[in-house]
Design a protein with these regions (language model features):
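Residue-level marker of beta-strand positions
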Residues: 143-144
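A short beta-strand-loop-beta hairpin characteristic of the jelly-roll/cupin
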Residues: 107-140
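Ligand-binding loop in jelly-roll beta-barrel domains
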Residues: 71-75, 82, 129, 136-140, ...
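Double-stranded beta-helix
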Residues: 8, 12-13, 17-22, 100-101, ...
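Non-heme Fe(II)/2-oxoglutarate
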Residues: 47-61, 66-72, 170-177
């Protein structure tokens, strides 16, 4: 089982000095049995976001929705993707997380989906295949994929977990995307 993720949050105190507001080990959670395990690190409701106060938008480390919950918002999370042979895809999972899917793409890979976001997908550990309608590429630690609202899926063809960092930023839907 994947380990917890350490999250350190900073702030400004009453004297105007920077300090550490919290330093916690966030639990990880699967949104569905056999699905990737996620730790939600932070979410914003819009841009610009407020840095005032000490409110924690994700105190339990769980962000269930893939796109930001608020127009103009953002999400950052760490996701541990198990090898494909251990992954039990639930067709309702993507729909429950507000992802778009199509039957023809699901036939290529059951995790094919798209969201109205710009995603920065960073491979931290392991290897993961990024699948698109036309083509695929292997990502290794340090590789970054800029996913711009396109249909895609993640395929872990290896024997160990692939740890990914995702930053999702709300975006306008693509007009010519079928």
């Amino acid at each position: 089982m994947p380990g917890k993720v350490r999250r350190i949050v900073t702030g400004v105190n009453a004297a105007g000095r920077s300090y550490i507001v919290s330093d916690t080990q966030l639990p990880t959670a699967a949104v569905a049995p056999g699905a990737p395990v996620r730790a939600g690190l932070w979410t914003t409701e819009g841009a610009p976001s407020s840095n005032k106060g000490t409110h924690d938008p994700v105190p339990d480390g769980v962000i269930l929705y893939t796109p930001p919950a608020h127009r103009g918002g953002s999400v950052i999370r760490v996701t541990d993707i198990v090898p494909d042979k251990q992954h039990a895809y639930d067709p309702e999972d993507l729909k429950n997380r507000r992802c778009k899917t199509t039957p023809d793409r699901s036939a290529k890979h059951p995790g094919f989906h798209c969201t109205d976001t710009v995603d920065y997908a960073i491979c931290l550990e392991g290897e993961i295949w990024a699948l698109l309608d036309e083509g695929e590429t292997l990502m290794r630690p340090g590789d970054v994929l800029i996913q711009r609202g396109t249909y895609h899926a993640w395929s872990n063809r290896g024997d160990r977990i692939a740890r990914m960092l995702f930053v999702l930023i709300d975006a306008e839907p693509l007009d010519n995307h079928r």
